[in-house]
Amino acid sequence: MTPEHLPTEQYEAQLAEKVVRLQSMMAPFSDLVPEVFRSPVSHYRMRAEFRIWHDGDDLYHIIFDQQTKSRIRVDSFPAASELINQLMTAMIAGVRNNPVLRHKLFQIDYLTTLSNQAVVSLLYHKKLDDEWRQEAEALRDALRAQNLNVHLIGRATKTKIELDQDYIDERLPVAGKEMIYRQVENSFTQPNAAMNIQMLEWALDVTKGSKGDLLELYCGNGNFSLALARNFDRVLATEIAKPSVAAAQYNIAANHIDNVQIIRMAAEEFTQAMNGVREFNRLQGIDLKSYQCETIFVDPPRSGLDSETEKMVQAYPCILYISCNPETLCKNLETLSQTHKVERLALFDQFPYTHHMECGVLLTAK
């Protein structure tokens, strides 16, 4: 695979290999055949980051080969959304002959949505001043004149200049209902929007008919908790990153959801609060004891759940676990399978043509 060529003819084979690999990894815990969710074969990534290489009068996007670390010029990137590809061409054309915008520019980050909005961040090794802002505004206006719905951001050390805003609003059809998700530049969002829809619909399907409330750790911008709110009486969710919490609060209002409560704290702190080990000012006015959480949802970082959180989730009759790293999922299952049984297993091909797999398991108490 090269950045400018996707081996689409190998899509089925690479997906089949992942299914076999996941089944083999899960064999100690379950004999289920994974439910398989396919990605679009191209234009599936909604975000991308590129270094910018200056070569005489020319400049262009590059990435580094993961093995050799050599530079690879990238003029088009079929893994990324069609909007990112349009913007890559337009940004280079707009910056190449503009000394103010190109000087010490070292990276461009793109974030796009299925609703055809974009935030583009230009990263610099220099101070950004009013002259930069004026030139950036002219570039933004020129891009919009090409019918590109784009917001530009300039970044340098301890500096962030938003020309308009640093977010875009995604609209996803999820099980017959449109969901609005605010996505903030430089915050985590699901990279493959088509796969995200399938993950949300699978999570809704496996929690159909759930009793009581839902607890979610690591909720981000509320991606899962807001979609799942329709299956539960109430949802209590934790998140540590301030921009993500603010986006989640916006998303609650935008989707007219009245049964979701977001708390800004780490999963480890929340465990202490639930166990009565510590009291937190942030929890004033929230009666944790009033929640009857029968289901816990976790979508942890690649490192998986720490041992304290493992113990905590075992207290819940139902565990829904989305994993971006099946190796740490299996490590967690060594503990969780002592008390819970795998009822559903899914493979989400979030990152086609790579070794990476995303998967989901539903566990119920034995």
Curated annotation (Swiss-Prot):
The UniProt record lists the keyword Hydrolase: no
Keywords (A to Z) from UniProt: Methyltransferase, S-adenosyl-L-methionine, Transferase, tRNA processing
Biological processes annotated in GO: tRNA methylation
Catalytic activity: uridine(54) in tRNA + S-adenosyl-L-methionine = 5-methyluridine(54) in tRNA + S-adenosyl-L-homocysteine + H(+); uridine(341) in tmRNA + S-adenosyl-L-methionine = 5-methyluridine(341) in tmRNA + S-adenosyl-L-homocysteine + H(+)
Role: Dual-specificity methyltransferase that catalyzes the formation of 5-methyluridine at position 54 (m5U54) in all tRNAs, and that of position 341 (m5U341) in tmRNA (transfer-mRNA).
Protein's recorded name: tRNA/tmRNA (uracil-C(5))-methyltransferase
PANTHER family assigned to the protein according to its UniProt record, in alphabetical order: TRNA/TMRNA (URACIL-C(5))-METHYLTRANSFERASE (PTHR47790), TRNA_TMRNA (URACIL-C(5))-METHYLTRANSFERASE (PTHR47790:SF2)
